[in-house]
From Swiss-Prot:
GO terms for biological process: regulation of translational termination. The lineage of its organism: Bacteria, Pseudomonadati, Pseudomonadota, Gammaproteobacteria, Enterobacterales. Keywords: Cytoplasm, GTP-binding, Nucleotide-binding, Protein biosynthesis. GTP binds at residues 20-27, 88-92, 142-145. GO terms for cellular component: cytosol. This is Peptide chain release factor 3. CDD domains: RF3 (cd04169), RF3_II (cd03689), RF3_III (cd16259). GO terms for molecular function: GTP binding; GTPase activity; guanosine tetraphosphate binding; translation release factor activity, codon nonspecific; translation release factor activity, codon specific. Belongs to the TRAFAC class translation factor GTPase superfamily. Classic translation factor GTPase family. PrfC subfamily. It comes from Klebsiella pneumoniae subsp. pneumoniae (strain ATCC 700721 / MGH 78578). The keyword Repressor does not apply.
Length: 529
């Protein structure tokens, strides 16, 4: 049975994001992945912060003139017979809710772990988000060219801390200065590492079979014997890879390598295109939509604002769920019930410019947005339904916003509500006073908000610390108990940008006590957009 051209395009797509703690090697791995996808010719071009981090690939220049930096947001490249979409999840200081929400637009994640450090804080948080949808996870243990922790220990830590089984696919031979390569458990092959080849794709020498004398000659008898001993242990103690369990998010295939030395990344990519799912079905408030449906549907998961005051433009990122996007097509923006013609969508196509006019399920397109599109918006060819599962997350950092000119309260509120619709920040209005509290998950969000209030709304504001530790959305089916709760806790209650009732806790202890005191009230960490 031959698939229709449309279904062939759907089957080729793989959409994933990389999750890691800052400095675990995400930027380097992104660069090496693009190198294998022939999106860039030589690595060493994704620079760190010092040079404003532009992954320079020629097709990314197109939006530069318009002053919107979408450079590293979405990268598409061919690999084997697939088309891979890699969504960037900002790390470091520009970490924000966008990072969380990007994970709702992918079908699979690659978790990168610094093998010298193991599971770190940011990785834990991002994994929690992937668990909301049981997203399949591949794992890459990075930095084998340095001294690392015991590989078995690393697997145990992932299993215990992140509650996901590990199925090693490759196993390291030595580490640091003694790093010799990896053995592939399912191909019964050893791939030998050469140093100094990080910027190019190298021809790797392969030794077939674990008991091959060539292996002892290549890595030394001691390391070869150590490998055989460790593998006996590994095969007895760890999970075998099972594709169904992987797709259910219950086990993660684990690869070892060094992104900097460009070794092992291709083994992981091979696994990704072979095992990761093609575009998955998505739930709406009325039915499930599958990628094979020919009518177009998509949802907005991120809005990127432009910090250049000369361009008021914002780009809404939409994940295509079903159907084919074609230039000039008419789509319905379900929330406002209006039909819009989309003629200038940005498509993120690597190299091949002739296909800029169309996009398929799994692809991400950018819509120009002049304040009319919100996060969570659904676009269809007329069907009235809304995609679910694009969450708001309870913020972890809070500040009070204060005006320099008290007469501008109205503009301030308008600005904050619009910025919260866009996902730049969350805003809370306490019921008991006139404060305005903003919440974020990354500290940079506050600076962005103050700068945008000034440039877009002509409001000069400053932020100051406030006694808030965390927030939870509250609801209850017991009206009487809920009224009592609201009456007794008025000082701690606020409305968010969408007028949803929120409990603002001064300390975690306070939150825990309040939750115990009111078992009939539900305290939620996430809320649907």
């Amino acid at each position: 049975m031959t698939l229709s051209p449309y279904l062939q395009e759907v089957a080729k797509r793989r959409t994933f994001a990389i999750i890691s703690h800052p400095d675990a090697g995400k930027t380097t791995i992104t660069e090496k992945v693009l190198l294998f996808g022939q999106a860039i010719q030589t690595a060493g071009t994704v620079k760190g912060r010092g040079s404003s981090q532009h992954a320079k690939s020629d097709w990314m220049e197109m939006e530069k003139q318009r002053g919107i930096s979408i450079t590293t947001s979405v990268m598409q490249f061919p690999y084997h017979d697939c088309l891979v979409n890699l969504l960037d999840t900002p790390g470091h200081e520009d970490f924000s809710e966008d990072t969380y929400r990007t994970l709702t637009a992918v079908d699979c994640c690659l978790m990168v772990i610094d093998a010298a450090k193991g599971v770190e804080d940011r990785t834990r948080k991002l994994m929690e988000v992937t668990r909301l949808r049981d997203t399949p996870i591949l794992t890459f243990m990075n930095k084998l060219d340095r001294d690392i922790r015991d590989p078995m220990e690393l697997l145990d830590e992932v299993e215990n801390e992140l509650k996901i089984g590990c199925a090693p696919i490759t196993w390291p031979i030595g580490c640091g200065k003694l790093f010799k390569g990896v053995y592939h458990l399912y191909k019964d092959e050893t791939y030998l590492y050469q140093t100094g080849k990080g910027h190019t794709i190298q021809e790797v020498r392969i030794v077939k079979g674990l008991n091959n004398p060539d292996l002892d000659a290549a890595v030394g008898e001691d390391l070869a014997q150590q490998l055989r001993d460790e593998l006996e242990l590994v095969q007895g103690a760890s999970n075998e890879f099972d594709k169904d369990l992987f797709l259910a998010g219950e086990i993660t295939p684990v690869f070892f390598g060094t992104a900097l030395g460009n070794f092992g990344v291709d083994h992981m990519l091979d696994g990704l295109v072979e095992w990761a799912p093609a575009p998955m079905p998505r739930n709406t408030d009325t039915r499930e939509v599958t990628a094979t449906e020919e009518k177009f549907t998509g949802f907005v998961f991120k809005i990127q604002a432009n910090m250049d005051p000369k361009h008021r433009d914002r780009v809404a990122f939409m994940r295509v769920v079903s159907g084919k996007y074609e230039k000039g097509m008419k789509l319905r923006q379900v929330r406002i019930g209006k039909d819009v013609v989309i003629s200038d969508a940005l498509t993120f196509m690597a190299g091949d410019r002739s296909h800029v006019e169309e996009a398929y399920p799994g692809d991400i397109i950018g819509l120009h947005n002049h304040g009319t599109i919100q996060i969570g918006d659904t676009f269809t060819q007329g069907e009235m339904m809304k995609f679910t599962g694009i969450p708001n997350f309870a913020p972890e950092l809070f500040r009070r916003i204060r005006l320099k000119d008290p007469l501008k309260q109205k503009q301030l509120l308008k600005g904050l509500v619009q910025l919260s619709e866009e996902g730049a920040v969350q805003v809370f209005r306490p019921i008991a006073n006139n404060d305005l509290i903003v919440g974020a998950v990354g500290v940079l969000q506050f600076d962005v908000v103050v700068a945008r209030l000034k440039s877009e709304y002509n409001v000069e504001a400053i932020y100051e610390s406030v006694n808030v530790a965390t927030a939870r959305w509250v609801e209850s089916t017991d009206v009487k108990k809920f009224e009592e709760f609201k009456r007794k806790n008025e000082v701690q209650l606020a409305l968010d940008g969408g007028d949803n009732l929120t409990y603002i806790a001064p300390t975690m202890v306070n939150l825990n006590l309040t939750q115990e005191r009111y078992p009939d009230v539900v305290f939620r960490k996430t809320r649907e957009h």
